[in-house]
Amino acid sequence: MIPGEIRVNQALGDIELNAGRETKIIQVANHGDRPVQVGSHYHVYEVNEALKFEREETLGFRLNIPAGMAVRFEPGQCRTVELVAFDGKREIYGFHGKVMGKLESENK
């Protein structure tokens, strides 16, 4: 084995990211005067206010891109992006502090 080499069992086929999770597609426009970059696990609902989109629809969603990647929105640019629902406990903490807890109430 070569240092840094990754060996993959080809018989297993491709790995599908976020299989079975709820996804949605939205249009995002950067109305600011600076580029805005959004990382793979950032809660889209809480991104920079210069990014304009139907914000309420994005509660509990992140970009559907591989971990560690990001999407950059240049000033004046409009892009279509795919989102994927957060999984696990569905609790959001940090970011801009707009949620700070469970996404759904206990009654659901």
UniProtKB/Swiss-Prot annotation:
- Known pathway: Nitrogen metabolism; urea degradation; CO(2) and NH(3) from urea (urease route): step 1/1
Q: List the Gene3D superfamilies.
A: Urease, beta subunit
GO MF term set:
urease activity
Query: What's the top EC group for this one?
Result: hydrolase
Q: Which reaction does it catalyse?
A: urea + 2 H2O + H(+) = hydrogencarbonate + 2 NH4(+)
One matching Pfam family:
Urease_beta
Keywords on this record?
Answer: Cytoplasm, Hydrolase
- A single GO BP annotation from the record? urea catabolic process
Q: Identify the GO cellular component terms for this protein.
A: urease complex
The compartments listed are: Cytoplasm
- What EC number(s) does its UniProt record assign? 3.5.1.5
The UniProt similarity line reads: Belongs to the urease beta subunit family.
* Assembly behavior: Heterotrimer of UreA (gamma), UreB (beta) and UreC (alpha) subunits. Three heterotrimers associate to form the active enzyme.
Task: State what protein this is by name.
Answer: Urease subunit beta
